[in-house]
Amino acid sequence: MDEKIETRLIGATVQSNEPDLERSIRPKRLSDYIGQAAVREQMDIFIRAATNRREALDHVLIFGPPGLGKTTLAHIIAHEMQAGLKQTSGPVLEKAGDLAALLTNLEPHDVLFIDEIHRLNPAIEEVLYPALEDFQLDIIIGEGPSARSIKLDLPPFTLVGATTRAGLLTSPLRDRFGIVQRLEFYRIPDLIHIVKRAAHILNVVIDENGAGEIARRSRGTPRIANRLLRRVRDFAEVRANGMINESIAKEALDLLNVDIRGLDVMDRKLLETIIKKFQGGPVGIESLAAAISEERGTIEDVIEPYLIQEGFILRTPRGRIATELTYQHFKLPLPTQSTLQENFDLLGKVE
């Protein structure tokens, strides 16, 4: 992926310098896990029940957009179960032996966390199925006619799989998870709580309005909120007395080109191109990519999802259309009623 995409300030994917920082502010207990009330309540019940029965927790699938706390929840599950945690990711497991090495080193009730589980090699999945269902590992010894299969018993364990692309999971793998949790984007009050908690851990002085200003521009994502907090902290220490209030947060985020709706330069460039160069659309993805000098995949996977979710653009069979919200955001007059009606007649054909 393009370096400028990876280091995008309001990008939800983890950046190279962030794992240690995220660990330092990651909650360890469900009681400290902010937001996702339904998920938190359900997991509390499931964990308590499994603990009372002295059983391993059912296998858990966690899915949702990046930056919402899937890894954090996996760590909390292990901590609440008073179990060990082994962590890996789908692309890392290249051979069946890689998975076998992990499984045979698990202790009873341990948690095996596989991030990006949708990227598992199909051959790895085949090895995983009996391990999940029967806590057994089938290993092939030897090659050719002399090859034979032996079964190894595994201790009862919990697989926690995390993915941003649940639709890419194969049905056999998806069906083996007894617990499936979807993480939603966070509400502003929850993000304010998250910002204030992180500020306390980082010894940053921040008031309610300062936390609110950061939360409103965080695109519903805790990882982005924590990243913006660190950048606003830098600004406050250099340009102010180190304390973050609403005006300091606003000035810092404006300087960083993150506007009140969490849009950055790339978002605004795409939206303004649709409005000014293509009269609000519809415009095909290839034409749009050429107009803003970005790859099609970058637009579809990185820029568009948040804009579609927030209602700034619509995808139709004839192309992308800027909505009324986009015109309002840029304080631009709406197109003529006939043009607007023609565009919005496509609403019934949204992809």
From Swiss-Prot:
EC number(s) on file: 3.6.4.-
Protein name: Holliday junction branch migration complex subunit RuvB
Binding site for ATP: 25-26, 67, 70-72, 133-135, 176, 186, 223
Pfam families recorded: AAA_lid_4 (PF17864), RuvB_C (PF05491), RuvB_N (PF05496)
NCBIfam families: PRK00080.1 (NF000868), ruvB (TIGR00635)
Catalysed reaction, written as an equation: ATP + H2O = ADP + phosphate + H(+)
Binding-site residues for DNA, renumbered to this chain: 296, 315, 320
Function noted in UniProt: The RuvA-RuvB-RuvC complex processes Holliday junction (HJ) DNA during genetic recombination and DNA repair, while the RuvA-RuvB complex plays an important role in the rescue of blocked DNA replication forks via replication fork reversal (RFR). RuvA specifically binds to HJ cruciform DNA, conferring on it an open structure. The RuvB hexamer acts as an ATP-dependent pump, pulling dsDNA into and through the RuvAB complex. RuvB forms 2 homohexamers on either side of HJ DNA bound by 1 or 2 RuvA tetramers; 4 subunits per hexamer contact DNA at a time.
Keyword Cytoplasm found: yes
UniProt-annotated stretches for the region Large ATPase domain (RuvB-L): 1-186
Organism of derivation: Coxiella burnetii (strain RSA 493 / Nine Mile phase I)
InterPro entries per record: AAA+_ATPase (IPR003593), AAA_lid_4 (IPR041445), DNA_helicase_Holl-junc_RuvB (IPR004605), P-loop_NTPase (IPR027417), RuvB-like_N (IPR008824), RuvB_C (IPR008823), WH-like_DNA-bd_sf (IPR036388), WH_DNA-bd_sf (IPR036390)
